[in-house]
Design a protein with these regions (language model features):
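A bilobed periplasmic-binding-protein/Venus flytrap-type ligand-binding module shared by bacterial periplasmic
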Residues: 131-136, 252-265, 284, 288
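Early extracytoplasmic/lumenal segment of secretory-pathway proteins
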Residues: 17, 22-90, 337
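Short amphipathic alpha-helical coupling segments at ligand-binding clamshell hinges
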Residues: 42, 186, 220, 255, ...
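An extracytoplasmic/periplasmic, membrane-proximal ligand-sensing/linker region
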Residues: 181-183, 290-337
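Periplasmic-binding protein-like
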Residues: 126, 156-162, 188-191, 196-199, 234-261, 275-299
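Extracytoplasmic ligand-binding site segments that recognize negatively charged/polar headgroups
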Residues: 32-40, 63, 76-214, 224, ...
Length: 337
């Protein structure tokens, strides 16, 4: 999702998704920054399993929803926030706006994918990759480490979307590994190399690499899988590859959900979180067009092909990924936002 500027007009966010309202029971409001189709499938299945609970879905970019929840404060109609990336949840946690997730729900997923203090639960995972077009660049000629993207030999060959919230964890990892000065130099070099290939979103990066308009780019893996599913393997000459094991460009981040402290339907909201990490909820994620990794044990996906447990990402935990604010500040400093 793209970093957006929050305005009061977003307070009028219209409800979408979910099933038609049913009579009786309780209605919880879900603020969702996750993929609409997957969210709708999860909500529909949850409502069938919980006939006394209706879910009203309000979808928008996660950063916009973050700002909206903060602006609404104790008056927020949101009961649950479902994000694409952990920094959005960490931001609300830091603001003290999230309630504790039930211990039984947290026990369903590995603790490394959850809030370190139990304020939100991890639901699915994604990993940063390079997408490349072998018609323009051979795999052996690709950078294997994130800092190499600033090498002048890649000028006009690399694309990325600096406004995507998916890119913030990568910057945070580079900051952790190399410090601010080196990260600033890297971003300026990457900016110079991307030139006309600084894109508004990862969909554009994915499409243009696939069409042969630019050699390679940085995305999360699911964008490529989603494109291939939409247009077919025969129309997808592009490929994806990982950075070197444990390089800070190789970042695993999680999508998660939390209950708002201001929720007036906490019991029903907690039930929804429990469903997200249940076998049924995780199977929906495993077979959805989101192409993310389910994180509950015993649930696997055919796509992505590399199993979650075989990934070798940079060793950074969710607390260290933080709220993403340092990454945003640095992007603004180098005028990429």
């Amino acid at each position: 999702m793209v970093v957006a500027v929050f305005t009061l007009t977003s307070l009028s966010l219209a409800a979408c998704g979910g099933s038609s309202p049913r009579t009786g029971g309780v209605t919880i409001t879900l603020y969702s920054g996750q993929h609409v189709q997957t969210t709708d499938a999860l909500v529909s299945s949850f409502e069938k399993s919980n006939p006394t609970v209706n879910v009203a879905v309000r979808s928008n970019d996660e950063d916009t929803l973050d700002a909206q929840i903060v602006a609404e404060g104790s008056r927020s109609p949101a009961d649950v926030f479902f994000s694409e990336n952990s920094p959005a949840l960490e931001y609300l946690q830091q603001k003290g706006l999230l309630a504790k997730v039930s211990a039984a729900t947290l026990a369903k997923t590995p603790s490394k994918y959850d809030s370190p203090i139990g304020d939100w639960v991890g639901v699915s995972a994604r990993v940063s990759v390079l997408i490349y077009n072998p018609r323009l660049i051979e795999k052996s000629a690709l950078p294997t480490r994130i800092l190499q993207l600033a090498n002048p030999k890649y000028k006009n060959k690399v694309a990325f979307a600096p406004g995507e919230t998916d890119f913030q964890p990568v910057i945070t990892a580079v900051l952790k590994a190399y410090g601010k000065n080196a990260t600033t130099k890297w971003l300026n070099g990457l900016k110079a190399n991307a030139t006309s290939h600084l894109y508004p979103n990862n969909e554009t990066v994915t499409n243009d690499v696939n069409r042969g308009l630019v050699a390679f780019g940085v995305i999360d893996q699911y964008y490529w899988y989603r494109l291939r599913a939409e247009i077919g393997a025969a129309s997808t000459p592009s490929k994806i590859t990982f950075f070197a094991p444990h390089d800070p460009g190789y970042v695993l981040d999680v999508s998660g959900a939390g209950v708002l402290k201001s929720s007036t339907h906490k019991a029903a909201a907690q039930r929804f979180l429990t469903f997200l990490v249940s076998a049924k909820g995780q199977e929906i994620i495993a077979h959805s067009i989101s192409f993310e990794y389910p994180i509950a044990s015993g649930v696997t996906t055919a796509q992505p092909e590399t199993p979650l447990q075989e990934l070798q990402p940079y060793p950074i935990d969710l607390a260290q990924l933080g709220t993403g604010q340092r990454a945003i500040a640095l992007l603004r400093e180098v005028q990429l936002l």
